[in-house]
A protein has these predicted regions:
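Juxtamembrane, membrane-proximal amphipathic segments and lipid-exposed surfaces
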Residues: 1-2, 84
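A transmembrane-helix-recognition feature enriched in membrane-embedded lipid enzymes
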Residues: 3-66, 118-122
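Soluble catalytic domains of membrane acyltransferases
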Residues: 60-160
Length: 160
C-alpha cells in the first residue's frame, strides 16, 4: 500500500511540476519567442528564465532555495557549470544559481516535448548521445558559445 501511495504522490508531483513549467512558458511566450529568434539575444532569454520562470516553478513547487557560493560569479565571465541531474528541479536550480547566462547542453530527445521542445531546440546545444559525431560537435558549439561570453551548463550524468 505504501508503494502505491508513493507512486501516486510522485505522479502528482510530476504533473504539478510540468503544469507550472508550461504555465510559466505560456505566460512568457511572446518574450521567449522574441528572444529565442536570434542567437545574440540569448542573454535576454536566459534573464527571463532566471528572473521569472525558475522562481515561478520553484516557489510553486514549495521550494525556497538558499544559494551559498564559495566564491561569487564574476559578472561578464564565462563559466562551465557541471552538476548531477536527478530531478527536473535541477534545471531550475541551475537557472537560479547564476545571473551569468549559460547555454544548456542536453539530449536531443527533449525536442519532442510540446511547447518546451520548441524553445529547447532554439536555445540549447543538443546532443544525440548515440551518435559520436554529434557528441564531438558539442565541443565546437560549446566553444563558440564560450567565445561569445556565455557559460555552459551541463548534466553529464543525467538520469532524468
Amino acid at each position: 500500500m505504501q508503494k502505491a501511495w508513493d507512486y501516486l504522490v510522485y505522479g502528482l508531483w510530476n504533473v504539478w511540476f510540468y503544469f507550472l513549467s508550461i504555465v510559466g512558458i505560456l505566460f512568457l511566450f511572446p518574450f521567449l519567442l522574441l528572444f529565442s529568434a536570434y542567437e545574440k539575444w540569448y542573454p535576454q532569454f536566459f534573464w527571463l528564465a532566471h528572473t521569472f520562470w525558475a522562481p515561478f516553478v520553484m516557489y510553486g513547487m514549495g521550494f525556497f532555495p538558499s544559494v551559498r557560493l564559495s566564491e561569487p560569479f564574476e559578472k561578464g565571465k564565462s563559466y562551465v557549470l557541471v552538476a548531477n541531474h536527478t530531478s527536473m528541479i535541477d534545471i531550475m536550480l541551475m537557472f537560479w544559481v547564476t545571473k551569468n547566462p549559460g547555454v544548456f547542453v542536453g539530449k536531443k530527445e527533449l525536442v519532442k516535448l510540446p511547447i518546451f521542445g520548441y524553445f529547447y531546440k532554439r536555445v540549447c546545444i543538443m546532443v544525440d548521445r548515440q551518435n559520436i559525431k554529434s557528441r564531438k560537435a558539442v565541443y565546437d558549439r560549446a566553444e563558440k558559445r564560450l567565445r561569445q561570453g556565455l557559460g555552459i551548463c551541463i548534466f553529464p550524468e543525467g538520469l532524468v
